[in-house]
Amino acid sequence: MPPFDVPEGDPFGPHNLPYGVFSIPGSSDGPNQPDGPDRTGRADRTGRADRTVGVRLGDHVLDVGAAAHALGSPYASLLARPTLNPLLAAGRTAWSDVRRALTAWVTVPSHREVLEPFFHPLSSVTLHLPFEVADYVDFYASENHARNVGQIFRPDAADSLTPNWKHLPIGYHGRSGTVVVSGTDVVRPSGQRKAPADAAPVFGPSVRLDIEAEVGFVVGVPSEPGSPVALGDFREHVFGLCLLNDWSARDVQAWEYVPLGPFLGKSFATSVSAWITPLDALEEARVAPPERTHELLPYLDDTDADQDGPGGYDLRISVALNGHVVSEPPFSTMYWTAAQQLAHMTVNGASLRTGDLYGSGTVSGSAERERGSLLELTWNGRDPLELPDGKRTFLEDGDVVTLSAWAPGPDGVRVGLGEVTGRVVGRGV
């Protein structure tokens, strides 16, 4: 099908236009890219210069740098790059201007002849990590998930939530160097683990490897050290979102996490989707977050009617294990919003950097079929999942996990959020 002939209702139509980075196998000079100063920058962590920014339309990707040069766009120098970081840093005005231009390019018939050479079938390209990750922070924002975890590990506690949970978004710093793009194999991690009945810890591969279905938020504009980012400034700093799988070794995590929290049980791999959906594509998906049950401190209080619209997002996530859907977590149930997480992350004066990534935390709904981790779905291994290819409590070598999602868009159409997939491999494979 020609690139412009996107079927009506396609979740990757002109209403969406997510950004990614791609290369064409066998091409070392970049797809349709000019030489010269506009090809500066680094691609991911590899320094590869054969990668370039693309925008998805249907089942094609548009080389937006080449298109911008051909059409004389003033933003060509931001787009003809091997990573999204220059565009991320350019700020909200540039983001809006580029999006308006892209929408016109792919919808106005007079542009077709110029742009058609710069479209490539998705089946013919390789997708890469779309931005250079600066810092990575992960949160714990789902009340359903937090209560489930509390009931599993603290069954005798008077309250399954910790005393601070309703007062602040709990989070921790992860490892940006182990953020990988969808399709990257995940090697089963090793570490210390100790079962309750064991006299001493042992070392070896994790036997309780899990996933966490999350949404990641990508920071564009940095902030000054010592200057907190207010709730109302969220959209001035955050460019868009992606799907995120926070792989977790539950046995390693359980032994190590007291008193400082997650470390080796989390730091070995975090997978993200290859497409970054700009916030401007998700206006129709904005919803009010769940009702607050505790009064919030002013820097987290989002009840002000003057705020820039509701802070929640109605994102419908699907979790598939070896091709079988096992859960459909609803992001609209998240207690803490991305804006509140950003405000809390910077309230002490910690600065933002272009390319910062922060995860929402595991997304879990109130129903059993809406839980976003195997820990919850199997209730810590007590209730195995019955799948066509056998039972599962935690992940086995060779298992493939795929998260996909969509959001409500204009006129009833869906906004596709792509997918993030990863295959578990044993060490030495």
Task: Identify the residue ranges that each predicted region occupies.
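Active-site pocket scaffolds in enzymes
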Residues: 339-343, 351-354, 358-406, 413-423
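Short beta-strand/loop turn elements enriched in aromatics
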Residues: 311-333, 357-375
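Active-site microenvironments in enzyme catalytic cores
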Residues: 1-25, 49, 56, 62, ...
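Short beta-strand-to-coil "C-cap" segments at the C-terminal boundary of structured domains/repeats
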Residues: 221, 422-429
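Intrinsically disordered, low-complexity terminal tails and inter-domain linkers enriched
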Residues: 25-51
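Short, surface-exposed linear segments at secondary-structure transitions and domain or protein termini
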Residues: 335-346, 426-429
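A structural micro-motif recognizing beta-strand termini
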Residues: 23, 346-348
